[in-house]
């Protein structure tokens, strides 16, 4: 993006393209507000377990023409897969499959003079190569962020053949890498659109309140081409705003303007305004909220008032069907359960989730923490891995920067201190801030230890100085024994900064009752007791400004081996995989309801 620190942004973009496995183009902001043709539905598929598809050029989709012609592949009359969705939940044989699957479909395209066409993928997990009418047109790496490819001069009016090679193989240089505590879903997991735009269109924009000023909106607009002296209008009809801008020779324009009687967005009152951005040839509108957010001392301020974050985490998974969440209905289910718990914030773990979830969360009044999957064992010394991470975080921020609910950008989870790690994460923060400086930067750490001499919980990690808000994952009573009574446990961590307990809890199999002091019982009673103890300890953390139990629902994980109590599921959920609330759920609901 060309808004903040243009020269630095260009350097970051070039370095990302040099090192990342991606040939996709700059993202169109607010694709859901554009003229789109859906390519969702049933796609033909071929499982390519031994990686022969590209070698055999199956993307050409050739058919026998003569008596001696034959091909050892065909997309016809074979496996059908739904898009969007993961492949794991659609076929028993693909449940644990890791490798390549080819997706294919035909479509017609309405080509119009003076219009451009883009293929847009909401997400493909994890690597993808895209072929149109027998030609490779782009590739992308990263399973949770969108990408697009211009196809204006490549599509035909009728009978276009689109093939996508999808590969979810884990590798040491990937993000996440070889081992991670969730299911490795593969497939075209989010919407696929053919997007139509004018020749010169409104490619990108950013409209938000100034970080500290409650009556000043900052707006920036970027056209798709460097067209000078183009008139741009920004309108907010409900506020009587009608701002006129003129682009420079790079097609860029910005303005700051005052607003009167603005109702700021908050969890209690998630007000959104219709915002219209228009040029002579293009017009985009969407609902945008306005709020102030900043950290000062040990507090987090929302609309100039301290806020306590009553949070929860969830994966992008519907446990009842053992598959990825991909629809607005899925988002409603997940967010409704978080609302019933009394939450005002969601940590979208551990990766950017579906845009349906982000937009609906904003409407329902949830603040959001969004992160990329820098999860534990990443190759921090690998330059290519670093650039991949930079591309991912940039794609995440570009997609969601106009969502006022987005409050925190997360750069890592449970990483070990080292100089390569520090440089890697600092690069991610710089990449993030080159696009957006209005959110709070955070990361989750798990190295809090008990200092016997001081009788305090402490943490030694120099990187916390780079963050606006420090987050701690600590599983007292589960992975860590209590060194003293919970009510006597005091903390001295990240002094002078706001602190969030970003993960705590333990596992319980729904309906399993037993001793509340025996960890190996895997019982709801022990899980509830563990929660009580942690809530007692939280009273002794002076800079605690939020809690986020791990996790809302039980979720699938190959990490979890116990045959009777886990069976491939992480059972830390407050709600079971069948949707039943455990005893600890009621404890957290009461805890949150008593915080005003």
Model-derived segments and their meaning:
Residues 1-27:
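Bacterial Sec-dependent N-terminal signal peptides
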Residues 24-89, 161-165, 171, 532-535:
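Accessory carbohydrate-binding/adhesion or oligomerization-edge regions at the termini
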Residues 29-30, 46-50, 93-201, 226, ...:
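Accessory beta-strand-rich segments of carbohydrate-active enzymes
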Residues 29-34, 205-208, 264, 278-339, ...:
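N-terminal carbohydrate-binding accessory modules
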Residues 131-137, 237, 280-281, 303:
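Short strand-turn-strand beta-turns centered on an Asx-Gly dipeptide
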Residues 155-159, 222-296:
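Extended acidic/polar, glycine-enriched regions
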Residues 199-226, 592, 596:
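Surface beta-strand/loop "capping" patches
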Residues 218, 333-336, 345-591:
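Substrate-binding/catalytic cleft of secreted carbohydrate-active enzymes
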């Amino acid at each position: 993006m060309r808004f903040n620190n243009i020269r630095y942004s260009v350097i970051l973009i070039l370095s990302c393209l040099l090192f990342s496995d991606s040939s996709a183009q700059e993202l169109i902001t607010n694709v859901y507000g554009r003229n789109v043709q859906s390519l969702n539905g049933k796609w033909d598929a071929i499982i390519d377990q031994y990686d022969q598809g590209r070698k055999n050029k199956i993307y050409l989709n050739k058919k026998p023409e003569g008596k001696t012609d034959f091909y050892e592949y065909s997309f016809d009359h074979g496996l059908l897969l739904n898009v969007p969705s993961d492949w794991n939940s659609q076929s028993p044989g693909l449940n644990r499959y890791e490798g390549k699957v080819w997706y294919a479909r035909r479509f017609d395209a309405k080509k119009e003079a003076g219009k451009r066409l883009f293929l847009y993928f909401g997400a493909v997990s994890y690597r993808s190569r895209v072929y149109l009418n027998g030609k490779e047109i782009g590739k992308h790496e990263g399973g949770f962020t969108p990408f697009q490819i211009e196809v204006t001069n490549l599509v035909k009016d009728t009978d276009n053949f689109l093939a996508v090679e999808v590969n979810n193989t884990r590798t040491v240089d990937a993000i996440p890498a070889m081992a991670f505590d969730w299911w490795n879903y593969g497939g075209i997991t989010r919407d696929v659109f053919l997007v139509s735009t004018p020749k010169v269109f409104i490619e990108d924009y950013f409209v938000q309140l100034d970080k500290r000023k409650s009556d000043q909106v900052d707006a920036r607009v970027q056209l798709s081409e460097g067209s000078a002296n183009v008139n741009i209008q920004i309108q907010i009809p409900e506020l009587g705003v009608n701002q006129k801008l003129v682009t420079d020779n790079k097609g860029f324009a910005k303005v700051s303007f005052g607003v009167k009687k603005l109702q700021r967005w908050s969890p209690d009152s998630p007000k959104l305004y219709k915002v219209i951005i228009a040029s002579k040839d293009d017009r985009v509108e969407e609902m945008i909220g306005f709020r102030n957010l900043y950290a000062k001392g040990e507090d987090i301020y929302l609309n100039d008032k301290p806020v306590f974050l009553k949070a929860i985490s969830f994966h992008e998974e519907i446990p009842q069907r053992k598959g990825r969440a991909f629809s607005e209905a899925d988002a409603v289910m997940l967010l409704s359960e978080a609302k019933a718990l009394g939450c005002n914030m969601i940590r979208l773990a551990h990766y950017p989730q579906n845009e349906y979830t982000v937009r609906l969360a904003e409407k329902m009044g949830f603040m959001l923490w969004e992160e990329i999957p820098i999860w534990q064992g990443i190759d921090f010394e690998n330059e290519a891995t670093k650039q991949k991470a930079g591309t991912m975080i940039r794609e995440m921020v570009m997609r969601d920067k106009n969502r006022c609910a987005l409050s925190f950008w997360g750069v890592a989870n449970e990483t070990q201190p080292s100089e390569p790690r520090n440089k890697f994460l600092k690069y991610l923060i710089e990449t993030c801030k080159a696009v957006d400086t209005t959110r709070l930067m955070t990361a989750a750490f798990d190295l809090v230890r008990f200092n016997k001499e001081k009788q305090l919980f402490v943490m030694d990690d120099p990187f916390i100085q780079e963050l606006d808000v420090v987050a701690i994952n600590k599983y007292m009573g589960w992975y860590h024994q209590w060194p003293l009574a919970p009510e006597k446990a005091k903390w001295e961590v990240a002094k002078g900064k706001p602190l969030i307990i970003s993960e705590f809890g333990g596992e319980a199999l729904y309906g399993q009752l037993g001793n509340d002091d025996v960890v190996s019982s895997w019982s709801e009673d022990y899980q509830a007791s563990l929660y009580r103890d942690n809530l007692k300890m939280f009273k002794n953390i002076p800079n605690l400004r939020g809690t986020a139990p791990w996790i809302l629902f039980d979720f699938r994980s190959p990490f979890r081996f116990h045959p009777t109590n886990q069976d491939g599921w992480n059972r830390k959920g407050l709600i079971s995989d069948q949707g039943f609330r455990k005893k600890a759920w009621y404890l957290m609901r009461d805890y949150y309801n008593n915080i005003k």
